Amino acid sequence: MKVVIVGGVAGGASAVARIRRLDEHAQIVMIERSGYISYANCGLPYYVGGVIKEQEELTLQTPESFWDRFRIDVRVRQEVTAINPAEKTVTVHALDSGKVYTETYDKLLLAPGAKPTVPALSGMDSERVFTLRTVEDTLRIRRFVEDQKPKTAVLAGGGFIGLEMAENLVEMGVSVTIVQRPKQLLAPLDADMASFVHAEMRRHGVALRLGETVTGFRQDGDSVLTLLEDSEPLRSDMVLLAIGVTPDTHLAKEAGLELGIRGSIVVNERMETSVPDIYAVGDAVEVTHFVTGQKALISLAGPANKQGRIAADNICGGNSHFHGSQGSSVLKLFSLTAASTGINEKAAQAAGIAYDRVVLFPASHATYYPGAQSMAMKVLYEKESLRLLGAQIVGGEGVDKRIDVLATAIRAKMTALELTELDLSYAPPYSSAKDPVNMAGFMIEDLESGKVRQFHWNEVEDLPCDGNATLLDVRTEGEYRRGHLNGFRNIPLDDLREHLDELDRGKPVYVNCQTGLRSYLACRLLTQYGFTCSHLSGGYSFYQVVTQERQTARSAYPCGMEKL
């Protein structure tokens, strides 16, 4: 059997190694357009920033090492320009020599990945405008940074690559401005959770120009102007385009393969395309979203590697299936970690799913052990079935651990209530006896059993301020003085029982605290004294960050034990 693989990064490299492990006698040819294979795509921004010191650290394998270990014929700097499914051949152009030749195959695997989305804008040919996809792109940017020593940079786009590049450039002393049309960074997050990311970027000097449209670029001496639709141009020493990626599927289209959303390649669970003996994996393929069941594009290394393994199994006569992706991701931004899995509120609404959510601010580990850090956690679940839909966490230490637990729970099709039963490891340096994931389950359990009601930050302005409701802030006096919601009366939680006779049981009570814990306790107390009570999800901290994009959580102490 002869197998030809087009593309040698995540999906392609994973597949060829698996094919060899399954079939020692197969003839395997891997053709890669760039000069590198099996490189750490996700590490490219960190090489630009000097965090990864040596170029060799980016390449997990080389053509020589693949041959020595797996006897795989790797051909770099060669581009497949056409596929002939009827004759089972591909046309190959050797970029260095100019030679064009035909290669036969029994099985063909397409792993072309995705290419940076590059709009048709003027000035794209400027030597100071860059995109980042390949090792060659990375080397070009790093050379520019080392030689030209830019002081300012504009990043068009606020996705993973754009934000990682922003962090690395800032750490190198470059003043960075991010411009993008959407009004929030990191699309997998809801706008409220993205506010924490906005605050972190601004805290490190990154200027955010959100909701603005780039119309072109113009070279002006040793700088480049980024032209904006409704604002004055931005002058900088360099520009990096990071506005997203598009499936690189022109070969598949010309060969007559069925295409799906945004031109992606349609595959079944076996990673087979619409043409016999042609498989496809990675960022170029359309997948089924594990949560919604709808078709989606999910450009992540994890799914690409799994798909490569599955395609290899089936090429070698197996029967492996890819059951979809839920888009689990994590991102480091300065001292912050942002992570998500499953779907967010926007996606749930688009899918027509009736959902609810809880917001909490747990600590990364037991607060009496030094170094505990806070995180904002948001968990979505389906109202009727209580099926877990998604989660988003932003914070310091421990974010990655909790998002992976929640991703596993979603994959296992657990209900939100089953989070309470998870038996997770505990020691003071690592967690609390009730892990944050357990706590999310407890909160949902109380909501669904009617023990507590909640209202959300975007409903605060609609609260009755005409005296027909009691608005109560149960934080300490010091916290209240530093900032509070308009119209809310301060009665600290520990004093609440002494003031019950001052409250009207005929009026609904809306309670606020710093992070949602004390307001929950207040509602449990008030409910048992005959009041109808709701508490603010996420508390004043969440409201402040979302509405003003600056953190005020430092003004609170755990459970209100403030040192006055």
Spans of model-derived segments:
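Rossmann-like dinucleotide-binding cores of NAD(P)H-dependent redox enzymes
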Residues: 59, 152-153, 160-218, 298-304, ...
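Beta1-alpha1 glycine-rich phosphate/pyrophosphate-binding loop at the start
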Residues: 1-77, 117, 166-189, 328, ...
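A Rossmann-like FAD-binding core segment of flavoenzymes
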Residues: 25-27, 69, 75-96, 103, ...
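Short hydrophobic core segments
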Residues: 6, 103-113, 156, 234-244, ...
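Glycine-rich dinucleotide-binding loop and its adjacent helix/turn
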Residues: 110-172, 207, 261, 267-269, ...
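FAD-site-proximal beta/loop scaffold in flavoenzymes
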Residues: 125-149, 225, 233-313, 405, ...
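Mid-to-C-terminal Rossmann-like scaffold of FAD/NAD(P)H-dependent oxidoreductases
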Residues: 1, 8, 284-397, 428-432, ...
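Rhodanese-like catalytic fold shared by cysteine-dependent sulfurtransferases
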Residues: 417-428, 432-469, 477-510, 514-564
